[in-house]
Amino acid sequence: MKRDVLSITDLSKEEIYELLESAADLKAKRKAGESTEYLKNKSLGMIFEKSSTRTRVSFEVAMTDFGGHALYLNSRDIQVGRGETIEDTARTLSGYLHGLMARVMSHDTVEKLAKYSTMPVINALSDREHPCQILGDFMTIMEFKKKFEGLKFAWVGDGNNVCNSALLGSAIMGMEFAVACPKGYEPKAEFLEQAKALGGKFTITDDPKVAAKDADIIYTDVWVSMGDEAEQEKRLREFASFQVNTELLGVAKPDVIVMHCLPARRGLEITDEVMDGPNSVIFEEAENRLHAQKALILKLMR
């Protein structure tokens, strides 16, 4: 039966734990050089409206490791930008492919792709959510903290798509979530209401030190995301006091881990000292995107 993952909430707590176990197994097998050609002769289409280093490379490597094939499709390669509807594109690609991932400007696009295709569809980033990133993040948290229940997850910066998925995912997994954003940049009310319905415990503040106090995890992201360039000067001013630096780490737990979905703007949202310091798990987190996505691909396409 076809299954799509467009939001982290499309997965239950039990399924997330199963995916993390599968991801850890796949990671160990890759490190040991074991063959994992579970998707031989299967193809994954990858639609990119927004470019990405980590997303493209990790999904392509995943399909190579599985003995399958990944096809990169940007907006110049497909006819959607020249009049063909998303619905027709989804139906057509369903005849060629075994799965589709899409990194899109509008969440509506990935929803239509899922609705009109007969193959599984994965949201690899939309303006609403980034579930693949959060699966990699959760794998990293499990590696370093060995649990989720009772942890405090502090988000410092823009209440964006990654923040939305982190908020909802934390509610599912039983972590306390604290968001520190400048006024006007908080997660939208619908995501807060959804987190509350999932039993989530969260706080919203405009003081990074309040969010980071006794935190087990401090997470940040760029202040100016792709598509927000017109607001760059305004955002840099308003986020100036939301930097993740040594002073902020001082109010967190001594063994706090620092995370960032990358790419980072060093010297803006995070200092070199913290990014390259002993509390940083940022590059382990980046690698875990590969393993977590492999587990998801396998669950949906096998």
From Swiss-Prot:
Cellular localization per UniProt: Cytoplasm
GO CC list: cytoplasm
Superkingdom classification of source: Archaea
Keywords: Amino-acid biosynthesis, Arginine biosynthesis, Cytoplasm, Transferase
Pathway involvement of the protein, from the record: Amino-acid biosynthesis; L-arginine biosynthesis; L-arginine from L-ornithine and carbamoyl phosphate: step 1/3
Catalytic activity from the UniProt record: carbamoyl phosphate + L-ornithine = L-citrulline + phosphate + H(+)
Main location: cytoplasm
Residues annotated to bind carbamoyl phosphate: S52, T53, R54, T55, Q79, R103, H130, P131, C132, Q133, C261, L262, R289
Enzyme class: transferase
Residues that hold L-ornithine according to the record: N161, D221, S225, M226
EC assignment: 2.1.3.3
Pfam families associated with the record: OTCace, OTCace_N
SUPFAM superfamilies to which the protein is assigned, alphabetical: Aspartate/ornithine carbamoyltransferase (SSF53671)
GO biological process, one term: arginine biosynthetic process via ornithine
Any one GO molecular function term: ornithine carbamoyltransferase activity
Known role: Reversibly catalyzes the transfer of the carbamoyl group from carbamoyl phosphate (CP) to the N(epsilon) atom of ornithine (ORN) to produce L-citrulline.
Record-stated family: Belongs to the aspartate/ornithine carbamoyltransferase superfamily. OTCase family.
Alphabetized NCBIfam families for the sequence: orni_carb_tr, PRK00779.1
HAMAP family, per database record: OTCase
Protein name per Swiss-Prot or TrEMBL: Ornithine carbamoyltransferase
Protein species of origin: Methanosarcina acetivorans (strain ATCC 35395 / DSM 2834 / JCM 12185 / C2A)
